[in-house]
Curated annotation (Swiss-Prot):
Pathway: Pyrimidine metabolism; dTTP biosynthesis. GO terms for cellular component: cytoplasm; mitochondrion; nucleus. Pfam families: Thymidylate_kin. Its cofactor is Mg(2+). GO terms for biological process: central nervous system neuron development; DNA repair; dTDP biosynthetic process; dTTP biosynthetic process; dUDP biosynthetic process. It catalyses: dTMP + ATP = dTDP + ADP. It comes from Danio rerio (Zebrafish). Coiled coil: none annotated. Its EC number is 2.7.4.9. Catalyzes the phosphorylation of thymidine monophosphate (dTMP) to thymidine diphosphate (dTDP), the immediate precursor for the DNA building block dTTP, with ATP as the preferred phosphoryl donor in the presence of Mg(2+). GO terms for molecular function: ATP binding; dTMP kinase activity; nucleoside diphosphate kinase activity. InterPro entries: P-loop_NTPase, Thymidylate_kin-like_dom, Thymidylate_kin_CS, Thymidylate_kinase. This is Thymidylate kinase. Belongs to the thymidylate kinase family.
Length: 212
């Protein structure tokens, strides 16, 4: 490897927890420190698979639940070559949702186990840091544009949060919980501090494989 690799940093949380805003602020902060950084979002709605997912989320089409889950996973896998190349080039990737969202949302539906939901994503690039933005779903429901898409109901989001809490028991993943009920700047400071530490640590380590 010709240069120190970038870190893979993921922000997770229930809908409207502020992930997208914080991803943007973190990328700017990393760039201002003199390092390369880019944002990635899942689902990536620009691909053909992503467009199928987008139509489903916007309630323009209906898809069978197993099919939807596998489409979300395929959407992540199709971006793996790009992710690996960028990390090897020393670009830090800040990711707005990843496999953990896929597992939490599908396993919140009746009849889906965590294990079944995790299997399609086994072997994805393993994040160096996963920050969960903790926010009460009732508070999230009062934030802008809530309820416009499928899954944006408080009852479902509470179940999703429970599934995230189960996923966070996995000590092989570097989870950090952030209180997202505070101001944007307070949340950003915590995220920035945690990310700066992990970027330095990740430089000398190979990219791992998720859930292996």
């Amino acid at each position: 490897m010709s240069c120190r690799r970038g870190a893979l940093i993921v922000l997770e949380g229930v809908d409207r927890a502020g992930k997208t805003t914080q991803c943007q602020k973190l990328v700017q902060a990393i760039q201002q420190s003199g390092r390369a950084a880019e944002i990635m979002r899942f689902p990536d709605r620009t691909t053909k698979i992503g467009q199928l997912i987008s139509s489903y989320l916007e309630k323009k089409s209906n898809l069978e639940d197993h099919t939807v889950h596998l489409l979300f996973s395929a959407n992540r896998w199709e971006m793996v070559p790009v992710m690996k190349q960028k990390l090897e080039e020393g670009i830090n990737l800040v990711v707005d949702r990843y496999a953990f969202s896929g597992v939490a949302f599908t396993s919140a539906k009746p009849g889906f186990s965590l294990e079944w939901c995790m299997n399609p994503d086994v072997g994805l690039p393993k994040p160096d840091l996963v920050m969960f933005l903790q926010l009460n779903p009732n508070v999230a429901a009062n934030r802008g544009e809530y309820g416009n898409e499928r899954y944006e109901t408080s009852a479902f989001q509470r179940t999703v949060q429970q599934r995230f809490e189960e996923l966070m028991q996995d000590t092989s993943i570097n989870w950090k919980v952030i209180d997202a009920a505070r101001t944007i700047e307070e949340v950003h400071k915590d995220i920035k501090d945690l990310s700066e530490n992990i970027i330095s640590l990740a430089e000398e380590q190979p990219v791992g494989e998720l859930w292996r």
